[in-house]
Structure formats: C-alpha cells, structure tokens
Amino acid sequence: MAEVESRLLNCFATAFPELAPQEIPSVSMGSLGSWDSLAGITLLSLIEEEFGIGISPDDAAGLLSFELILDYLRQLPAEAAE
C-alpha cells in the first residue's frame, strides 16, 4: 500500500473509529451517517496536520469520499504529501 494511502487510512480511522479498516476505502459522506459537517471538519484538520498542507474551502467542498481525497492528495506536489 502506498504511503499516502496508508496515512490517509489512519486519518479516517481516527475521525471515524466505528469503521472497520476494510470499510474505509469505500466510504463517502453519503454512505456514512456519522460523516456530518463537524466530522468533515475534523477529518480535514487531521489530513492537513498529517500531510502539512492547507486545504482551501473550494477544494474541501469536493472532498466527499475516501477515494476523492486520495486522488486530491496524489495530485499535490510530491513534497507536500511527504
């Protein structure tokens, strides 16, 4: 598993401890009842801290699933995701 994906899995596991590890890669805001606006802010804060990045409000509005967030992180310059 790629390092970025592994680190993102850890962020999700912290924000949503009720999820089994194998559930995380397929989770989205629409599929997880506990992913409300507060949980979303918490998740994005964890991601910003873990990856040392800032996520703009415009970008955050589209980050509605594990897969979309992973794609977003993979598009960052390599040094930003280290």
Regions found by a protein language model. Give the residues of each.
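Phosphopantetheine-dependent thiolation modules in NRPS/PKS and related acyl-activating systems
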Residues: 1-82
